[in-house]
Amino acid sequence: MLIGPVFAREVAIAPRRPRLYITRTLFCLLLLFLMSTAWLVLTGTQLVRDLGDLARFGSALFQLLAYLQLALSVFFSALLAASAVAQEKDRRTLVLLLLTSLSNSELVLGKLLASLLNVLVVIVAAVPVFMLCALFGGVSFDQIARMFAVTLASVLACGSLGSTLALWREKTFQAVAMTVLVLVLWLAVWGIVATGAVFDSWLGLSCQAWAAGFSPWQAIVEATRPYVEAEPALGPLGTPVHLFLLVAVAISVLLNGVAVAMVRVWNPSRESQPVSREEDTWRRQSIWGAEHDATRAPPEGASAADQTDSADRQGAPAGTGLLTEPRPGAQVSEPGGDLPSSVPAGSADPHRSPGDAPAPDALAPKDPRTRHVWDNPIIWREIRTWAYGRKILIVRLAYLVLFALSAGSLYWMADSGTSLVRGSGSAALAALFLLSLVLVNAQAVTSLTSERDGRALDLLLVSDLTPKEFVYGKLGGVFYNTKEMVVLPMLLCVYLWHAGALSLEELIYLLVGVAVLYCFAAMLGVHAGMAYENSRSAIGTSLGTVFFLFLGVAACMRIMLAFSGQFEAQLPFLGLIVFGGAGLYLALGVRNPSAAIGLASFACPLVTFYAITSFFMSQNHLAFVAIVAAYGFTTIAMLIPAIDEFDVATGRTTIGEQ
């Protein structure tokens, strides 16, 4: 068997799932569609005279498709690896795997490769499509080989990162959020190094060579160039691309080695292990009955000596559930008999007959540590308890590090007189906003998938909670747990207004628009968590939708500008956006299709395209109106069925069955 039975099982059953064939077919069709539309844009706006024009087209097309494939591969490899392990933890099946005869390496490596199988199959299926780029000219087979080597090494490293973090963290949100934050931090740090802000050269290597040797994005940029110059300082490695391949393999070996060594130390975590509290054991009912135990219980505030003496009178050691023979001369009350004369005054009700049951307060003394639940228990649990683990603070600290990098870069550019609105300033702020949207969406979808995998959702459905209490409670918990991710980027916007980079009108547009997008991301996560019973499908669909709406549309516009240089040649890409809207409708309306969700699915990509176009044309008010109208309508279209007629257990409407 290949790397143990876990991976062998996935290899055996994966071809039986239609998802394997649908995924690789859609990805290849996407690449072919982009290639065709790019050709239509080129021939519709420019005159192709000779082979040189074809070669330049092939080179530019190859680079853009390579960047797109790397972004998708890195994102989904890390996400699928983390969610696969987190799902095993939520369903308590990882403990069962630990009880088997599987070795640590078979468990860790088998689960890692099983989660990456779909990504690897999709990459292999894309090889013939990229070979077509060589037919245009300007692309060599060495470039294609280097590009795929960098992509596969990045997939292995990012998947190992997600798997290791998921084995370490005990909650799904912690695993997904930490994976995303580490990836962004990895790319951001080496992106800063590539600009020369840290150093120009070190140990004989330029800053660009160091960045290409340690960053997947910088490595793919270097690998897609026609000629890669060798660096004498690297010696036998030769080029920064070879250095990156070595670094990626070393990172994968290191992460998997740590995971193999620590998997049985980390799991099961302390939070999932049952803990027997001493107070609960003390209050355990003895063989003499609850009435006798209530009369023998020490009063509140009693010292440890009084508790020990009380336990001796009952014949049991303090703090244990064991029963021993009573001490000689001790008064023992038989079940149903009268209370002994040694009972303190006030411990029994004088108006109660000897045969009646004791008062409830006498049987269950009030615990001063008891907490009162709010009217909405869902939001109380989200806010007042450690519902997502005590180590969620690490996620917040990691985000604060990234926020400090963005804020520091903006302050440095403002101090040096660099424009904060265009160029690097807007890119840093946009990346921070996108990261915040991804984290808010991840918090929302994992709040539902964790309940479902932990079998707690069934208990909530049989309670007297209304759909509004459940949905609003989850949304309130999402914004509370991600308050740093929501508030801090908005404070940066206020700083830009204070620095004079934004007017008051633009600040209002930005804050209101971002608030609408936050609401959309949170509601999208709740909607996907309700619609999909499989946690990995829910997380992948939810985060993939955010990825498509913002980065996918931006990539289409980048391709359009690369081949035409103007906005007039938009018609071919409108077909691609409509195609994406159809896929979005299938993803969002899989369980609860409606006309509102259908309209929103086709409107969001078009409106995002229109908003970016309006921004480039300095028509900020049109971009604001389009974003607020489209994403606000989509949020309401997902919210209304959830609080009115949506059955979170089955993912379908139940009004027609009543």
Where are these regions (language model features)?
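Transmembrane alpha-helical segments and their membrane-interface loop/helix boundaries
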Residues: 1-77, 83, 118, 122, ...
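Helix-loop-helix units of permease transmembrane domains in multi-pass membrane transporters
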Residues: 7, 84-116, 379-383, 387, ...
